[in-house]
């Protein structure tokens, strides 16, 4: 298809990183980007299918570590520096509303929210649109 794609794993479980064969050892991850340890471009790993910014379990504590004003815009500000390098940037988020998912919402142009065809899944999906007001 010839499109340049970046996948950013925002889930502390790191399933996207694992599924794409990306190792988070000895490499910067999205946690480092949030903590200001590196620029987002330093965390990009070249993959066979697409470029990836890996996650790791440290990301699970980022909610408590990021307390400053504007914490919901960290990802958007970092992505501005690399946005023109990619045709698509896919953000894989955890399945709960948190500082990570809010960062994904503020950084995104569009949302795709996969869900089970069940009433409880449908009720849970009602939160994001009303949450996004920026």
Task: Describe every region a protein language model picked out.
Residues 1-134:
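P-loop NTP-binding core
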């Amino acid at each position: 298809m010839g499109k340049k794609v970046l996948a950013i794993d925002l889930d502390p479980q790191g399933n996207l990183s694992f599924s794409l064969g990306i190792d988070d050892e000895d490499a910067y991850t999205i946690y480092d980007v949030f903590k200001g340890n590196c620029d987002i471009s330093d965390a990009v790993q070249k993959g066979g299918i697409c470029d990836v910014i890996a996650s790791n379990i440290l990301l699970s504590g980022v909610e408590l570590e990021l307390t400053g004003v504007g914490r919901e815009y960290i990802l958007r500000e970092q992505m501005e520096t690399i946005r023109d390098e990619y045709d698509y940037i896919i953000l894989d988020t955890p399945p709960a509303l948190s500082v990570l998912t809010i960062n994904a919402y503020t950084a995104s142009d569009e949302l795709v929210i996969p869900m089970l065809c069940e009433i409880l899944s449908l009720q849970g999906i009602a939160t994001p649109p009303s949450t996004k007001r920026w």
